From Swiss-Prot:
Belongs to the class-II aminoacyl-tRNA synthetase family. ProS type 1 subfamily. The keyword Nucleotide-binding applies. GO terms for biological process: prolyl-tRNA aminoacylation. Consists of three domains: the N-terminal catalytic domain, the editing domain and the C-terminal anticodon-binding domain. Keywords: Aminoacyl-tRNA synthetase, ATP-binding, Cytoplasm, Ligase, Nucleotide-binding, Protein biosynthesis. Signal peptide: none annotated. GO terms for cellular component: cytosol. Homodimer. PROSITE patterns: AA_TRNA_LIGASE_II (PS50862). It comes from Erwinia tasmaniensis (strain DSM 17950 / CFBP 7177 / CIP 109463 / NCPPB 4357 / Et1/99). Disulfide bonds: none annotated. This is Proline--tRNA ligase. It catalyses: tRNA(Pro) + L-proline + ATP = L-prolyl-tRNA(Pro) + AMP + diphosphate. The lineage of its organism: Bacteria, Pseudomonadati, Pseudomonadota, Gammaproteobacteria, Enterobacterales.
Length: 572
């Protein structure tokens, strides 16, 4: 590719609305342009990277035995109503009607469509197992699109779906896809971790996320210092504190706290140890519980894990915090003065709270708190559950070492769905015994567009992007200095360009009438791994300058050795 025949839309300045480095660099490198909130046009440089990601994923899917298909983006609403996700999915599901007032959705995922296809195409266990995938545009109506293509409304995703007649068969495919994902991300040069994860609105039993480690990540990833345990913070179990609960040493005392609206206020104003305070959070209860609200107790310095709390049978899903009006109707106090003593509703205490003594909490009277609260003396022990996020230093759930927490960007997610969709949509085949058998399913997603952003978050410097060789839009850049004024510079640049193209190398020849500084800056910005500079002075010594993007190594190479040298570098 020649720059004079290419749309190289680089920017010198960082756009003001770009928050994270990947968004900034994708705009500056001319990879994307914003059309509307959460919607982006992919320019040639960005599309070249995107296609390389797609090709790696496609190759690994083929190697894992998956078969490619293509399904419609627009899906009939009745399939979502049949699966039960029409209401469950929420406002992220973009709903629309056609000219005949028939309801449709823009697909964020394709579980319903693939299940409908399979129930009409398969009839016998002999046709299974089957693993189908597609690489296609998806749409989620994000309430606040942000971070460029990291959290956009329209995005490209690889989604695969497998069908089985046994859990054992599903496990085999799940393991194969786990390996395929690991191989894909390794080939892309990403520093990633596979972690245990929650199944979310997709549903099912087992699930793993593939997280690219980056400070800008939105997810907290938990690791053990003493084993290979890794999990999303939503799933990481917080073990009960070691040792028993200490005996009471204080009497319960009520004291005025008119200015303390939060735990932070309470700790600051009364110099209380935060680990001796308890937060009382009220959420909606299920109808079956016979109650309106449930009180959840966590230690003052801990955070409620909403995913864990939502799984408690008396807590309504999705988890919804009570409004101040709803709280006052039952307690006659505001959220800043709530506590467990005398509370007339179901209470669920975190394991850590259940092990506390002499703690402080609200008195359920505005502007009043208790100190010196003790279980069994001042109130009975409530229901106990793990409902908090782990923190660094907690014991690892597998009993080996302690926990560390890092930030991650989710780029892949695999699920063992079981029979959630096949039962709801009556997808079955004739089993080996002649009876109808409900299909067991797995689903497997990779965020193609998100991978591009995640790779940049991990690989950049002050000059721009540093692509791995597998993802770079171009592998080699040829920069001829003043080629319009030097016949031998132009002749060698053209010859080298043709030689590299003949060897199948993605090469860009910068044949613009630009200053050398501009040419260098652009190639560093878009992240070309290998740059060769052809200038009159070095040609006097029959040499060409080579520069590596990663590490910045510079070397002078003999002109008749440069092709072999580059091929050796590209083979590494």
């Amino acid at each position: 590719m020649r720059t004079t025949q290419y749309l190289l839309s680089t920017l010198k300045e960082t756009p003001a609305d770009a928050e994270v480095i990947s968004h900034q660099l994708m705009l500056r490198a001319g990879m994307i342009r914003k059309l509307a909130s959460g919607l982006y046009t992919w320019l040639p440089t960005g599309l070249r990277v995107l296609k390389k990601v797609e090709n790696i994923v496609r190759e690994e899917m083929n190697n894992a035995g998956a078969i490619e298909i293509s399904m419609p983006v627009v899906q009939p609403a009745d399939l979502w109503q049949e699966s039960g996700r029409w209401e469950q999915y929420g406002p992220e599901l973009l709903r629309l009607v056609d000219r005949s007032d028939r309801p449709f959705v823009l697909g964020p995922t394709h579980e319903e469509v693939i299940t409908d296809l399979i129930r009409n195409e398969l009839s016998s266990y002999k046709q299974l197992p089957l693993n189908l995938f597609q690489i296609q545009t998806k749409f989620r109506d994000e309430v606040r699109p942000r971070f460029g293509v990291m959290r956009s409304r329209e995005f490209i995703m690889k989604d695969a779906y497998s069908f089985h007649t046994s859990q054992g068969s599903l496990q085999e495919t799940y393991d194969a896809m786990y390996r395929a994902y690991s191989q894909s991300f390794s080939r892309m040069g990403l520093d990633f971790r596979a972690v245990q994860a929650d199944t979310g609105s997709i549903g099912g039993s087992a699930s793993h996320e593939f997280q690219v480690l980056a400070q800008s990540g939105e997810d907290d990833i938990v690791f053990s210092t003493g084993s290979d345990y890794a999990a999303n913070i939503e799933m990481a179990e917080a073990l009960p504190p070691a040792g028993g609960r200490a005996d009471a040493t204080q009497e319960r005392v009520q004291f005025a706290t008119p200015e303390a609206k939060t735990i932070a206020d309470l700790v600051e104003q009364f110099t209380l140890p935060i680990e001796k305070t308890v937060k009382t959070l009220m959420v909606k209860a299920t109808k079956e519980s016979g109650h309106t609200l449930v009180a959840l107790l966590v230690r003052g310095d801990h955070e409620l894990n909403e995913i864990k709390a939502e799984k408690i049978d008396i807590v309504a899903a999705p988890l919804t915090f009570a409004t101040e009006e709803e709280i006052r109707a039952l307690v006659n106090a505001g959220p800043g003065s709530l506590g467990p003593v005398g509370l007339n509703m179901p209470i669920v205490a975190d394991r850590t709270v259940a092990a506390m003594s002499d703690f402080s909490a609200g008195a359920n009277i505005d502007g009043q708190h208790f100190s010196g609260i003790n279980w069994q003396r001042d109130l009975p022990l409530p229901r106990i559950a793990d409902i908090r996020n782990v923190v660094e230093g907690d014991a690892s759930p597998d009993g080996k070492g302690t926990l560390l927490i890092k930030r991650g960007i989710e780029v892949g997610h695999i699920f063992q769905l079981g029979t959630k969709y096949s039962e709801a949509m009556k997808a079955s085949v004739q089993g080996e015994d002649g009876r109808n058998q409900t299909l067991t399913m797995g689903c497997y997603g990779i965020g193609i567009t998100r991978i591009v952003a995640a790779a940049i978050e991990q690989n950049h410097d002050e000059r721009g992007i540093i692509w791995s060789p597998a993802l770079a839009p171009f592998q080699v850049a040829i920069l001829p200095m003043n080629m319009q004024k030097s016949f031998r510079v132009k002749e060698l640049a053209e010859a080298l360009y043709q030689q590299l193209r003949a060897k199948g190398i993605d090469v860009i020849l910068d044949d613009r009438k630009e200053r050398p500084g501009v040419m260098f800056a652009d190639m560093e910005l878009i992240g070309v791994p290998h740059t060769i500079v052809i200038g009159e002075r070095n040609l006097d010594n029959d040499e060409i300058e080579y520069k590596a993007r990663r590490g910045g190594e510079k070397r002078l190479i003999k002109t008749d050795e440069i092709v072999d040298f580059l091929m050796a570098e590209l083979a590494q």
